[in-house]
Amino acid sequence: MKIGIFSESYDPVLNGVTVSILTLTKELKKMGHEVYAFAPRYPGYTDTENEVFRFPSVRTWAARDYPLAIPYLPKLIQRVNRLELDIIHTQTPFMMGWLGLRLARRLGIPIISTNHTQYAEYAHYFPLAPVEMTRTLIIGHLRRYYNRCDGVVVPSSPIAELLRDYGVRTPIHVIPTGNALDTSRDEEARSRIRQEHGIPADARVMLYVGRLAREKNLGLLLEAFDRLAHKHDDLYLFVVGGGPFEAECREIASGLECCKRVVFTGSVPREKVAKYYSAGDLFAFPSVTETQGLVVCEALGAGLPCVAVNAGGSPEMLVEGEDSLLAENDIEDFTAKIDLLLTDRELAQRFSIKAVENAARFSPHGMALRMLEVYTAGSHRS
């Protein structure tokens, strides 16, 4: 099968969308399928693979990290026609997504789209209009786009329900992104990373991995750590990742009494992120806007007991009472759930063992097999 992937987000930007695309692409190629990616050009970045086609792009004030594609390049569109694609799979419902839709209809082939993001929760990034007005416009846009597709893929059932509430009537398939990152425990990496950051070998480390953005609810994480650090004097917090909210997070942390026990790594290459999981003892995830929360799956693979806010798609990746505890989105409950795992070490150890077992559910190969079933269903529908 020849598959065309269209996305605003792609290498070199590191986020859940890019990781999902690369994971799927790798597995499909292993199975003998041809996969071609179409994405915006990123200044200063050169692709190492011939199957990636770049469109001209511009940077915008609303999303400085994500160049906006200008999906008009006649020669490139002619090249798409010559590829004789069997299906188009869009990953974003914006410029590249609409281009993929137009090309699919022109070529008479099916189009599938994956919804990776709760876009309406990002309305605050567009300050020129009231947030509720922006949310309404975004929801209408999503409904129009997805109802023109032959199938929609989401990583968790809460997101499927959300799209149905928006009025999406296209068949929706739930397929979590597979975890291709080897986060299995590495004692040498654990020791080295702790030494690099001046953390004692016998300290306990609360870990967060992900973008530092306002919608990640990081104020809750920092306030919870501040409370817990007074009770547990061996507790440190690792914040692994970068993003537009990083400076503000650092400023908040600098005002904490235990600020010297908060470590910000900034952006970290994905291969090194795997090692940071080994340095942790517990994974704390405050985000309420995740469609899946792939980092939660990665944390399970590292054997980390998890505490997550019971919202969005993250809870579906966990088995509460086996590998994790779910908390309400308030400081008292979130702090209490983390404190329970810090205090009851036997419970934390049981969760750690089950976490590794449960992580096996998120197989990249299984993800690709299920996606191929969706492609087939889309072919019949189109």
PLM feature spans:
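Nucleotide-activated donor-binding/catalytic signature segment of Leloir-type glycosyltransferases, i.e.
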Residues: 250-268
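Conserved acidic donor-binding segment of nucleotide-sugar-dependent glycosyltransferases
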Residues: 320-332, 340-346
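A conserved mid-protein helix/loop that constitutes part of the nucleotide-sugar donor-binding site
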Residues: 19, 204-227, 237, 244-250
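Short hydrophobic beta-strand element within catalytic cores of glycosyltransferases
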Residues: 296, 305-308
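Short alpha-helical donor nucleotide-sugar binding micro-motif in glycosyltransferases
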Residues: 80, 145-146, 267-268, 275-280
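Donor nucleotide-sugar binding/catalytic pocket of nucleotide-sugar-dependent glycosyltransferases
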Residues: 39, 53-56, 132-135, 139-188
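Aromatic "clamp/platform" in nucleotide-sugar-dependent glycosyltransferases that forms part
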Residues: 288
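N-terminal subdomain of nucleotide-sugar transferases
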Residues: 1-56, 369-372, 376
